[in-house]
Amino acid sequence: MFRRTLARSLGIIGLAAILAAQLAQAQDSPPIRVIERVDGAIYVVRARDGAELKIALADNAQIAGIIKASLSDIKQNSFVGVTAMPQPDGGLSAVEAHIFPEAMRGTGEGHYPWDLRPQSTMTNANVEQVVSAVDGRTLTLKYKDGEKKITVPANAPIVTYVPGDKSDIKPGAKVFIVAVKQANGKLQGRAWRIGRDGVTPPM
């Protein structure tokens, strides 16, 4: 998958309280990608690895839409999340980046392993510096106990968040879900990120 809450204007309250631990838990679960069907209160989803999973919507689930943004939207002092791959020269190259609204500043702050690809990492941090180049930008990302420089290629998908609600969670929707396994072994979705206008959440 946090320390801040999403603004009431987004209709997403209390995100910080739930998601800090869930991000780590989500890395051990299949990333969830497409809503297949709805069986009563259960959403049947197809994970990236092809597995079919049954997810219950938590009573206090946080729902947000994901829309396309651009590299030029990432500016100094933006708070972003960047999935990156290690490079032969020891640097990091972004696979994707998502721009958090101001009210989500601090969400999942840090640098840690991620499950998008083997050896991929996630860095959620403040943009300290942006250096532009013909083929992309290099971001200096500063978080509570360190910093990373990550090159963002011009073709890396960039997205941001918009308000969402339960009506967005429907068959065919492309999603990223932070799901937690309950004591009974069933999965409960606490944070739902739904692609809008043909966008696939790239995290």
What are these regions (language model features)?
Residues 9-22:
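Bacterial N-terminal signal peptides
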Residues 2, 22-203:
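Short, flexible, surface-exposed loop segments at domain boundaries
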Residues 1-4, 8:
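Positively charged n-region of N-terminal signal peptides that target proteins for export
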